[in-house]
Amino acid sequence: MTLIPSSTPPLPDAIGRKMPLLKFLLPLVGGIVLAWTCKDMINRWEWLIAALIFTLTAITAIVGKRKWNGWTSAIAMTLALICIAGAWSMQRYNEIVTHWPQNEQVWLGQVEQIKKIKESHTTVIAEIKSDKKQYNQKRIQVSLQGNETLKLQSGTNIAFKARINEKNRPGNPGDFDYATYLLQHGLSGSAYCHTAQWQILTIPTTSNWHTRFLHLRQKLVNQYAQYFHDTDLSLLAALTLGDKSLLTTETQQLFSDTGTSHVLALSGLHIGILISLFNLLLLKRLRYGWKHGAATLFLLAALWGFVLLAGAPLSLLRAALMFSFMQVAQSLQRIHSLSLNNLALAALLLLIIDPFTLFDVGFQLSFTAVFFIISSNDYLWQRHRLPFWKDDIYHFNTPRREFYTPKAYFRYFTLPSWKYRIKKHSYKIFRSVLIPFICISLSAQWGTAPLILHYFHTLAPYAWLANFMVIPAAYILLSAALLFLLLPFSFTQVALAKVIEWTLHLLTQGLQAISEWPFATERVYATSFTLVCIWFVPILLFFFFEKRKTLTRKALLISSVALLIISIGAETFSTLTIRRITPRICVYKATHTSLIHFIQSNAISYLLSSTTADSTRLRMTPIEQNFFMPNHIASPTLITQSQASYPTLQRANGLFLFHHKRIVYLNLPFELNAIGPIDLLIVAKGSPTNATQWLANTSVRQVVLDGSLTSRQRKVWTKACRATHIPCHDVLQQGAFIWTLP
């Protein structure tokens, strides 16, 4: 055996040369971000006027003959592109933003897509049908209750009575900004309807191609439902058809904890599997000519049909565009069919169609992963490959059998030859399949790690290892599901259903086992600077080892060390100052429940709840994830006794003393004349009904209405506070009340 080392080729061209469309993509991205940041200050016409001024400046510089006119024209044209992108973004923003009536009204709508199916309600995307121009064809998200939701499908007309909210009500600290999420996804508002507040209409429906494909997807899911149930059905529908409405929170959490959520979102992985099957079965058997061209056109038509069938998610649109460019390039016998420039072109097209696509997490993860996969392959993996295998001359000379006994021939020639061939093919598989698989997985994980930590605060160290299980399973499931749908015979579907069921069970059990490993899932809350360092420090170190000039190597090494030192300093400063919790009182937003939190420090705090310990733990789960964990707040001590004394908190029935402040928890009608001035009055269910008289006889600085009050009690106390000129905070309307103590 001889291994022939391959010489290391020089560094490829810079990113700017490999990606010439980057000069258009970056101004477009910058304009969208600036427009969103300044959406309340700069309107569309101001962006257009600025774009016109910069365009005229660029033209003037091009016509002129001075030395610096080239730079002037380039800068002016870049600024003009930024302003044009800003104007287009504001145009899109104005189309989405809608000021809905403040009262409940009856609306007509058509279901576009079923977003999520839960036991309590079903969430759909609906298009409003109205005679008023400002409301017609606006897309909103509606949550519907009742058994009738089982009859909903794409294209169904519904009538519902609700108040549509364009802005979400403030919630608890660290809560998800739901209104911004809806706006960035082209949705003008949200509504919630109880069972008696909506109904399905039997009027004829007019559906577009998108709705028809979604209706077809629902039929295919129903076909799955004849053989699969519960978790198997939800996973199969998500992995093969992009329908994630049936996925449970537990299943999504399992894939998130193991770092394999990408397999649930249809993307380049799934399209790559389908195209590889098509190439293997058909395209590779056809020479370049009209037959190959016809097969390519059929492949592209099937590809885009699959995109529409899956609901056209952004990750799938990106993959479909890139694979379309790749197939066309291969038909034209172009060598570099999969390039960074194709990635930039796909991003440009999607951002021109809808600029707010930029803020979609799936869009960011998809493009970042592909960018790092291609870049790492060009700069690192293709330049430092394992050596080739070269056969020894001995193995080309096989002696004649008649000179040896069968036993001797088998021992000295046949058996060594088998061992040699096994070793040779194993090495080729290791070099051509296993190593590229690991490299792609590590590149994607490195590129998407900062975004995942920023949005989800989750680190899955074994994600690259879990891909060895997930990706082969996805290949089997897609292939079997394709045959399952194309061969509608009972005996074939039963056999394929068994294969799919076994694969799904092995997949879920394997991921469950990985999720139980030590350090399988870590919650990380890092500063933005540290997240950026995850990208740039490895890049600087890579060029440090590649460059040969001493000064360049010193500059790269110093830059890497400086970034690491600044990152450590930023994390230390954030932990000691920004995330250090000072004494405060928090009255959280929770319906039908009182949740009052007395915080002394990050390590010491006390919680008063009006419900049981199990119910309190359930209601506090999102607050712990969004507020406690990012700020390193320990679990609070639950106050269970009416008479209690702690180092910084004393309780006597409804009276609390915390940091020399008097706090009254009013859930019983009793007199407080002997207590004196009240710094904070928390009104709960069971409080006295004569609110005005009660407030007039006491000295109260601040009133807080917690979530346990009924709407009638809330109105009574709000009116009483206005009459007595006492500040009043309603947690259900204004969000959690936070009082930072001196």
Residue locations for each model-derived region?
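N-terminal leader/targeting segments
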Residues: M1-Q102, R318, H336
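Membrane-interface helix/helix-cap signal primarily in integral membrane proteins
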Residues: T2-I15, K67-W71, A80-H262, I633-Y646, ...
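Hydrophobic alpha-helical transmembrane segments in multi-pass membrane proteins
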Residues: K23, G31, V63, W68, ...
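Divalent metal-coordination and catalytic microenvironments
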Residues: G31, G109, A162, L239, ...
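Membrane-helix interface and helix-disruption motif detector
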Residues: T37-E46, V361, L465, E522-A526
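Alpha-helical transmembrane segments of polytopic membrane proteins
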Residues: W45-T55, S366, N467-P472, S528-V532
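Non-globular, low-confidence helical/coil segments that flank catalytic cores
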Residues: T149-L150, K161, D392-I422, L486-P742
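Hydrophobic alpha-helical segments of integral membrane proteins
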Residues: W209-Y227, L235, D243, T251, ...
